[in-house]
Swiss-Prot record:
GO cellular component, one term: nucleus
Gene Ontology terms for molecular function: DNA-binding transcription factor activity, RNA polymerase II-specific; RNA polymerase II cis-regulatory region sequence-specific DNA binding; RNA polymerase II transcription regulatory region sequence-specific DNA binding
Gene that encodes it: hoxb7-a
Motif mapping: Antp-type hexapeptide: 129-134
Cysteine disulfide partners in this protein: none
UniProt family annotation: Belongs to the Antp homeobox family.
UniProt-recorded name of the protein: Homeobox protein Hox-B7-A
A Pfam family this chain is assigned to: Homeodomain
GO biological process: anterior/posterior pattern specification; regulation of transcription by RNA polymerase II
Annotated region of DNA binding: 140-199
Keyword Ion transport found: no
Function per UniProt: Sequence-specific transcription factor which is part of a developmental regulatory system that provides cells with specific positional identities on the anterior-posterior axis.
Cited PROSITE patterns: ANTENNAPEDIA, HOMEOBOX_1, HOMEOBOX_2
Region Disordered, residue ranges: 197-220
Length: 220
């Protein structure tokens, strides 16, 4: 009994659903209210609330070419487009084409090449060439080849064991000592001549040995 009393006291504070709807808090609206509203923002409808279906159909189907209009009048004036705006990208293309045509002029190309040559010659004249930068060409004056102490020591060791070198051994020594094959060959020839002068004798055996050595040098 007490629980029912408290429940009635609680629900009596709030109005019923019928009283709420009858007072107009939630006005009844049907689906026809959306169609009857003349001002629907976002769809751009006419004040009458309906679209001119007849005029639209006539504009679409009256002419077959209307589906692909060629005139820029199809764009509204609100976009700020006119007939000249569609040709805005033509001018850069024409400028590039004209520049390419001008680049093919032989007189201008020759003048540009001449200016480039003059600038290169001017830059070369300002460069300072050191002796170690010069190439060893045919026009260079041939001088005496100097060998370092290490190179001379290694060549003397090799000459002590072999007075004549094979081509393979000559290439190996040239690679180790950072010399050319021709330099190794010339050094051994000069060293053999020096050795012959030091050990020169009048014995026939020595003369025959010298002849044999000269023949071997000619074969090389």
């Amino acid at each position: 009994m007490s629980s029912l009393y408290y429940a009635n006291a609680l629900f009596s504070k709030y109005p019923t659903a019928t009283s709420v709807f009858s007072s107009g808090v939630f006005p009844e609206q049907t689906s026809c209210a959306f169609a009857s509203n003349p001002q629907r923002s976002g769809y751009g409808s006419s004040p009458g609330g309906t679209f001119p279906a007849g005029s639209a159909a006539h504009g679409l189907y009256s002419n077959g070419s209307s589906l692909h209009p060629q005139s820029p009048a199809m764009y509204p004036s609100s976009y700020g487009l006119d007939a000249a705006s569609f040709n805005m990208h033509c001018s850069p293309f024409e400028q590039n084409l004209s520049s390419l045509m001008c680049a093919g002029d032989p007189t201008k190309q020759n003048s540009a090449k001449a200016e480039q040559r003059e600038s290169e010659l001017h830059n070369e004249a300002n460069l300072r060439i050191y002796p170690w930068m010069r190439s060893a060409g045919a026009d260079r004056k041939r001088g005496r080849q100097t060998y370092t102490r290490y190179q001379t020591l290694e060549l003397e060791k090799e000459f002590h064991f072999n007075r004549y070198l094979t081509r393979r051994r000559r290439i190996e020594i040239a690679h180790v000592l950072c010399l050319t094959e021709r330099q190794i060959k010339i050094w051994f020839q000069n060293r053999r001549m020096k050795w012959k002068k030091e050990n020169k004798a009048s014995s026939p055996s020595s003369n025959s040995q010298e002849k044999q050595e000269t023949e071997e040098e000619e074969e090389e």
